[in-house]
Structure formats: C-alpha cells, structure tokens
Regions:
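Bacterial Sec-dependent N-terminal signal peptides
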Residues: 1-28
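A short, amphipathic beta-strand motif
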Residues: 23-35, 60-62
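Short, ordered, surface-exposed loop/turn motifs in non-cytosolic proteins
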Residues: 25, 34-48, 131
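Short, acidic Ser/Thr/Gly-rich low-complexity loop/linker segments typical of extracellular
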Residues: 49-61
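Short Pro-Gly-centered beta-turn/loop motif in secreted/extracellular proteins
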Residues: 63-73, 79
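A short, solvent-exposed loop/turn motif at the edges and junctions
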Residues: 77-91
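Extracellular beta-sheet/turn segments enriched in Thr/Pro/Gly and aliphatic residues
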Residues: 90-130, 136, 145, 152
Length: 163
C-alpha cells in the first residue's frame, strides 16, 4: 500500500512540475479612474481560438500570466465604468530564456461622465476599440504597442471631449 501511495505521490509531482514549466508572459498592470485606483474589477481574456478565461482582481495593481504564442484580447470590466480593451500577441522566440514583463496602465472612464457628454455615442464608439496591440519586438528584446499612434489619437480625442 505504501508503494502505491509513493508512486501516486511521484506521479502527482511530475504532473505539477510539468504544468509549472509552461512559459508565460507576465503582465503587470494598474487600473485607475478619475478618482484614483480602481478595485474589484474583472479581467476577461479572450483567446483567438474562442476560449474565454475570467479573472477577478481585488486590487488596482495586478499581475497576470499569459501563455506564450497566443493572440489575446484583454477586457477590463468594472461596474459603472466603460469597458477598456487591449490586444496582445504573446509570440516570443523559443530560445528566449528570460521573457521580459510588460507594464500596462488602464485609465477607466466612469459611465456617468460619458453620459453627460452631448456626443456620448461617438465617445462610446471610440472606446470600443482596443487601446493598443502589444507585440514582442525581436530587435529590442522588449514589448511594443504597435498601435501607439492610434492610441495617442484616441486619448487626444477623449481628452478634447471631456474638457
């Protein structure tokens, strides 16, 4: 009986160690709004194959581990705020030993503030788009937002509308 339990224990350890050897991209992010840090929000991971995973975050600062070699749409969902999105392509070279983390900042907009604007439909339509598309830059060994100019344009339009 002891031998069977020992073999079962070793088998479980091998399964756990195999699962922890998967490579991940570490996303460090902070979620704020006009009043400070946002707590108790949901992060929805939508994978290119249709798989959806949901994580509840208690604090504004959160770390998310995403598997490599996937295209993922992240949605930050919080009650009384407009949902924000960002697309991430986690493809990295197979021989890369250390995968650098990516730091992300989300500034959520309260739905009450948007509803007070005369052009609220245009603002909501702007906010439907992902704020960026993050990919790994092989030359610089870092992560880049390949839509940074688009992101800057959206942010300028939003600031202009909320003045």
């Amino acid at each position: 009986m002891k031998n069977i339990l020992f073999v079962f224990f070793i088998f479980q350890c091998l399964i756990i160690s195999a699962a922890t050897n998967e490579r991940h991209v570490h996303i460090h992010f902070k979620v704020t709004n006009g009043f400070g840090e946002v707590t108790n929000f949901i992060i929805r991971e939508i994978y290119e194959n249709g798989k959806i995973d949901t994580v509840q975050a208690i604090e504004a600062n959160h770390i998310l581990d995403l598997p490599v070699n996937h295209k993922i749409l992240l949605e930050i969902i919080c009650p009384h705020h407009v949902t924000r999105r960002i697309a991430i392509n986690t493809a990295v070279p197979d021989d890369l030993e250390y995968i650098p983390f990516y730091e992300l900042f989300f500034d959520l907009i309260e739905t009450d503030v948007v509803n007070l604007q005369p052009n609220r439909d245009e603002i909501l339509e702007l906010l439907l788009f992902p704020v960026g598309y993050v990919t790994y830059n092989f030359e610089h060994n870092s992560w880049d937002n390949t839509l940074s100019e688009f992101t800057k344009t959206i942010n300028k339009l939003l600031k202009k509308n909320f003045k």
